[in-house]
């Protein structure tokens, strides 16, 4: 099946490294989801009260906070990921490869943070459909498409490069949506 093709293409060290890198990455983006929830609440309350300027301001402040905080957590993980992986596995090859691929993606953390929080801010205005399409489309078209192109020449590194590129593009798309959203100009329903 497809799992066997994946295993043959990448090998057991790459599969283990991928698993550990995904686990460690989760530590970096948790703060972004927290700030995204706060953005939904702050923007939603302001928007519901008819204060659209304040709603947009809260959205922008939260997005900046999310991007900065995730840049910081990404930077810390970039430094400390060898230690994190030493806790997760005794295998030096897996630790080294996990750190290598995770560091590729960590460069995109500020954009990932911006996308998470922008989606939350837009959700607070009731703008859910377009951000959902942007998320879905970027993952299924950009990330998957690039991964298919890059996996053969670059293996697991190619998959993580594809993810980093997609996260940057998604971040830019959602920042653009936040900047141009008509919802900040419309009265609450």
Residue ranges and their predicted role:
Residues 1-6:
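Short, small-residue-biased leader/transition segments that mark boundaries at the very start
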Residues 7-26, 92-100, 127, 161:
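Interfacial/gating helices of multi-pass transporter permease domains
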Residues 9-10, 87, 125, 153:
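Alpha-helical structural context
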Residues 17-81, 112-135:
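Small-residue-rich hydrophobic transmembrane alpha-helices
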Residues 33-36, 105-124, 130-140, 146, ...:
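Short runs within selected transmembrane alpha-helices of multi-pass transporters and secretion channels
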Residues 43-108, 150-189:
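Short alpha-helical transmembrane segments in multi-pass integral membrane proteins
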